[in-house]
Amino acid sequence: MNKGAPIRVVLFGVGVIGSGVLRLARTRPGVEIVGAVVRDARLEGRPLEEIVPDGPTGLRLSADGARVLSEMRPEVVVIATRSTLPEVLPTLRLAAKARTAIACTAEELAYILPGDGPEAAEIFGLAESHQVPIVAVGLNPGFVLDVWPLLLASIAHDVSAIDAERAVDLSGFGPNVRASLGVGYSATDFDRELARGKIAGHRGFRESLRLIGEAVGRPVDETNVRTSPIFAKRARELIGGELSPGQTAGVRQLATGTSAGVQWLRLTMTASVALDEIGVEPVDRVHLSGSNDLTAIISPGSRAVPSTVGRIVNAIPKVATAAPGVHSAADLGLTPARAVR
């Protein structure tokens, strides 16, 4: 990396989050987007400005990630595509073989160990064999329900229990993300798709629980996640679709972590396009129980899309200089936005 030169970045994924990354990165003199990779081969060669009018100029979309990495030689690859390890593993392989630092938003990457399965073992192997950092970045997991409680724990005397909650408005997301979060189903379809795994609600609860447990010296040996639907009371126009009364408007979820038979971690998520109908305001809240109880609140809550985008772009300089290996979001340290002059 040339000292003083912008960090060269290739982005995989130009959805809602990826588009936001492109827009914000354009305002950062220390970051230069040199490539944008999409899955849809029909978009090959199209000017990026046609998809993201207020993003970087002079770039064309490509569905050939290997070629883009070879030609553009980025210092950082940002992967903002899918949620699970099997889904992002092919892109992680490409980026690691290109020997570039990697920032990835996949929720299942937020906290992994080599023994967590074949995909996790391969990811650790990629980082070691190619001597690159693979860094988990994101808002949740990655900040609200894990890193933020740990920051608060920095001023605690001890921690006997943690209770964190998040209420988030989903109306800023497109139809694919909404569907995975449980929006737009009948009651019967919701139950079926939840059982099949198509509806995940919030992914990353288990990763956040394990991350917190390891960080405070009380490893979690049992996790549990319960999910229930929220139903719409009236029709709503949404991005790329509409919602009818009686369809699901989102989910309520409770995740718990237990250590040696003691449940001491509770993470709660209310995610809906109709928070107003259930009398809930967007909010992030964490309460630490201990010798000196602590409570912190972000109100009206960190908005999902812009806050995730900020978390990613602000992390790029740290990712570029990270040591080789697999890093959780807690390993990043502070990544504040730059002051406006």
PLM features per residue range, with description:
Residues 67-76, 85-107:
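Rossmann-fold NAD(P) dinucleotide-binding segment
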Residues 143-155:
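Alpha-helical support elements that line or immediately flank enzyme active sites
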Residues 12, 153-284, 302, 314:
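Active-site-lining helix/loop region of Rossmann-like oxidoreductase modules
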Residues 39-41, 82, 106-110, 139-140, ...:
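Short, ordered loop/turn segments at secondary-structure junctions
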Residues 274-341:
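C-terminal helical cap and adjacent loop that interface with cofactors, partners, or active-site loops
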